[in-house]
């Protein structure tokens, strides 16, 4: 019996963020692909000045010496449970939040760095 697209979407919607990360990794391995965004060439000719990036991804690069404080900060920022936050922190580098505004990204970066983490905005 083949699954319908609707059944697949419902199954994915029920998964946690950590389970989705594992699923994406499994897809990458099985199909030998990368989930990284494809770079698009800028239009040639009289292109206007490059627009400032409006959406950022907050990436936890390293948790540093104070892992417990970083886990607490991650839980606070993402709403994840203790185990999910711990797994995310220990799996660094990991993207914590995607598509956030520059202000929200900078605020989250500041909180995590105060807890001892190394964070980058991309």
Swiss-Prot record:
One of its GO terms (biological process) is translation. It comes from the Bacteria. Keywords: Ribonucleoprotein, Ribosomal protein. One of its GO terms (cellular component) is cytosolic large ribosomal subunit. HAMAP family: Ribosomal_bL12. Belongs to the bacterial ribosomal protein bL12 family. Homodimer. Part of the ribosomal stalk of the 50S ribosomal subunit. Forms a multimeric L10(L12)X complex, where L10 forms an elongated spine to which 2 to 4 L12 dimers bind in a sequential fashion. Binds GTP-bound translation factors. NCBIfam families: L12. Forms part of the ribosomal stalk which helps the ribosome interact with GTP-bound translation factors. Is thus essential for accurate translation. This is Large ribosomal subunit protein bL12. It comes from Acinetobacter baumannii (strain AB0057). The lineage of its organism: Bacteria, Pseudomonadati, Pseudomonadota, Gammaproteobacteria, Moraxellales. The gene is rplL.
């Amino acid at each position: 019996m083949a699954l319908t697209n609707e059944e697949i979407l419902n199954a994915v919607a029920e998964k946690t963020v950590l389970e989705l990360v594992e699923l994406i990794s499994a897809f990458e391995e099985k199909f030998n692909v990368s989930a990284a965004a494809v770079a698009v060439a800028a239009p040639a000719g009289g292109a206007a000045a490059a627009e400032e990036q409006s959406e950022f991804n907050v990436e936890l690069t390293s948790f540093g010496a104070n892992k417990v404080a970083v886990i607490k900060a991650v839980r606070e920022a993402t709403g994840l449970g203790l185990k999910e936050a711990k797994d995310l922190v220990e799996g660094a580098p990991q993207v914590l939040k995607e598509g956030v505004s520059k202000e929200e990204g900078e605020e989250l970066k500041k909180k995590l760095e105060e807890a001892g983490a190394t964070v980058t905005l991309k």
